[in-house]
């Protein structure tokens, strides 16, 4: 090869195959420090417990020089082979000293590195670490502080639900109107569902037993319109709902509309005896215990001095014109 170093091109002296041109520009023996000279003084080495290295002799230097020259001469004939051998030896030394090196060697040998199908162990480990780091980060971001429903917070919730109506209240709107920092839509949705079940249990519409949230719910009185909304079947049948429980004055609210019927409607019954649809079906509904005619008669709504029929539910049959 043209790049190979030919030893015959240089002037070689007879003293140990020394090349004089290689020594040009190098310091002389007088300029160099003695091999027996220690860079660390003995007192300093003793103070810091430094073990002095063995001093080198001229024989050691000659031996190292001969080893270097022989490696250069051997490398000129096959530089690629020697470099590959050195790399393999270095890899073997590193692999034998590190744990798990057998699996890495197996992956490297299976890849062959020619067609790019091999997998670099370092890159694979870095990718695994990156994935685990991403999972840990996502797990931290998903953790949220648990919200505790206090009586004050529940009272605010009840006020908002009463304002919207239990049927029309949705978690998103409730959350916006409550305007509480840290309150999420999931918190409101879960609390709203428990609150509706609580209202149904209070009205006897479900057979479910008491829950752990009943103590919190009982801390704030339930607005009457919430009972009306949750109990009303709605619609054209005229069934407004079931009566409000005794804790909120059932007997008084049921007597007030009946008293308004006998007192406020007495003159109207005599004047419109033949044309009053309510009078024609009065016996039927009175015998059935129904008060649905109060809703179908707008004149009666005006004569009701107590104003209770528009805000509280009634019990019993359907519309006055049902038959």
Swiss-Prot record:
Gene Ontology molecular-function annotations: DNA binding; DNA-binding transcription factor activity
Superkingdom: Eukaryota
Annotated region described as Disordered, given as residue ranges: 1-25, 53-139, 267-298
Knocked-out gene: effects: Mutant plant flowering lacks a photoperiodic response.
Species this chain originates from: Arabidopsis thaliana
Chief subcellular location: nucleus
Gene3D superfamilies assigned: Homeodomain-like (1.10.10.60)
Physiological role: Transcription factor that is essential for the generation of the circadian clock oscillation. Is necessary for activation of CCA1 and LHY expression. Is coregulated with TOC1 and seems to be repressed by CCA1 and LHY by direct binding of these proteins to the evening element in the LUX promoter. Directly regulates the expression of PRR9, a major component of the morning transcriptional feedback circuit, by binding specific sites on PRR9 promoter. Binds to its own promoter, inducing a negative auto-regulatory feedback loop within the core clock.
Name this polypeptide is given: Transcription factor LUX
InterPro entries xref list: Homeodomain-like_sf, LUX/BOA-like, Myb_dom, Myb_dom_plants, SANT/Myb
Induction field: Circadian oscillation with peaks at subjective dusk.
Assembly: Interacts with ELF3 and forms a complex with ELF3 and ELF4.
Biological-process GO terms, alphabetical: circadian rhythm; negative regulation of transcription by RNA polymerase II; positive regulation of circadian rhythm; regulation of circadian rhythm
Annotated compartments: Nucleus
Coiled-coil regions listed: none
UniProt xrefs under SUPFAM superfamilies: Homeodomain-like (SSF46689)
